């Protein structure tokens, strides 16, 4: 009889233990977004999204009250996805990524994208807003250069849901003031950037500036992208490129 009672008691204890375990999995996770590393001198607002595999969705525009501090929320336990964007409001970024409209350049965006398993009572995620854009500044050094228009083309049109460079058509016609023009570029996946010299509706010449930028030692894989300065000296029979301390000159025949 004692053995029978012990068996029943053991079974009840086992059932209770399973029940407690199941209840704990149903309890939410306390998610702490650590925003201490966000540079508030550069990023004034961040659009933050949180999704969990079980369907929870959170979106908040965080200003200086939150940036540089912590933000705490409760989320269902499971796989958690976090996105944060700064400087890209006009392009409505979100969990699906960021798409640059054809004909426009990249916003001066700072980004964080991550995913992790939140299965415990508490999870902490450090938000690192990386500089995911490069400002290309072009200085014109020749009177002939100003007689033409210029466009930058490429094969990256934004970022996908995991923060990777997204394949797509990119084109931006540059405008110049006092011989200086700028274009904001997204992080490149290859060296396919081109500079088109335009004569009205016609493309007069095309230069593979993506290759020149890489040859200059520029690194598109850095966490925080550097800006780029390029000097262009375009004459009737030659063109010279200078990117930082790197130089290249081309000569070509004039067909009359």
Residue ranges with predicted function:
Residues 1-18:
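Sec-dependent bacterial lipoprotein signal peptides
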Residues 18-256:
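Extracytoplasmic cysteine-anchoring/structural motifs
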């Amino acid at each position: 009889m004692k053995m029978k009672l012990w068996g029943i008691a053991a079974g009840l204890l086992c059932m209770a233990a399973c029940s407690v375990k199941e209840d704990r999995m149903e309890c939410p996770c306390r998610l702490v977004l650590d925003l201490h590393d966000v540079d508030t001198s550069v990023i004034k607002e961040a659009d933050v999204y949180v999704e969990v595999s079980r369907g929870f969705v959170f979106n908040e525009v965080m200003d200086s009250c939150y940036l540089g501090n912590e933000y705490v929320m409760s989320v269902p336990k499971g796989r958690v996805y976090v996105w944060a964007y700064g400087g890209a409001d006009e392009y409505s970024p979100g969990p699906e990524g960021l798409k640059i409209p054809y004909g426009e350049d990249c916003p001066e965006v700072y980004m964080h994208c991550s995913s992790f398993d939140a299965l415990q009572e508490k999870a902490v995620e450090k938000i690192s807003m990386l500089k995911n854009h490069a400002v290309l500044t072009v200085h014109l050094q020749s009177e002939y250069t100003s007689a033409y228009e210029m466009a930058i083309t490429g094969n990256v049109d934004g970022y996908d849901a995991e923060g990777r460079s997204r394949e797509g058509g990119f084109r931006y016609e540059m405008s110049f003031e006092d011989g200086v023009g700028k274009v904001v570029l997204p992080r490149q996946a290859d060296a396919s950037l081109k500079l088109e010299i335009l004569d009205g509706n016609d493309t007069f010449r095309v230069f593979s500036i993506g290759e020149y930028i890489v040859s200059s030692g520029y690194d598109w894989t850095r966490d925080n992208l550097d800006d780029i300065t390029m000097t262009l000296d375009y004459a009737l029979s030659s063109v010279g490129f200078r990117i930082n301390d790197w130089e290249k000159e081309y000569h070509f025949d004039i067909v009359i």
